[in-house]
Regions:
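C-terminal, non-catalytic "cap/extension" segments appended to globular domains
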Residues: 1-121
Length: 121
């Protein structure tokens, strides 16, 4: 993706999710052309910042899905994860808790279909 393409995507996202933002093209031409995403310094300084949200969300959706079938089992997994705290790596913690890896494509596909069905999409 070129820088110009990234700027266009950012402009579209801002228009959709933050329509109240109105850049003055004379005062902030860089931002009005879609460059505001570059103000998010953690994109550059902590590149896994946003990925962490995605991984956590997939694990949370796994627990949500399991809770629909067996709330007790889902709560046990969640409690185990909480008790383990930061005692190990992320992948080892979720494995010890009985949660599938969010890197598993089959897990992502399955959750996508289940969420889509739940939302009647």
């Amino acid at each position: 993706m070129t820088p110009d393409e990234r700027h266009e995507v950012w402009k579209k996202l801002e228009n959709e999710y933050q329509p109240f933002i109105n850049y003055d093209e004379n005062d902030t031409p860089f931002h009005s052309m879609g460059g505001a995403w570059m103000k998010k310094d953690h994109i550059f300084t902590t590149p896994f910042y946003y990925i962490d949200y995605c991984l956590s969300q997939i694990c949370a959706l796994e627990l949500w899905d399991e809770s629909n079938a067996d709330i007790k089992s889902a709560l046990e997994k969640y409690n185990t994860l909480c008790q383990l705290g930061g005692s190990d790596t992320f992948l080892n913690l979720i494995k010890k808790s009985g949660i599938e890896s969010p890197f598993n494509v089959d897990v992502i596909k399955s959750l996508a279909f289940k969420c889509s069905s739940f939302l009647n999409l």
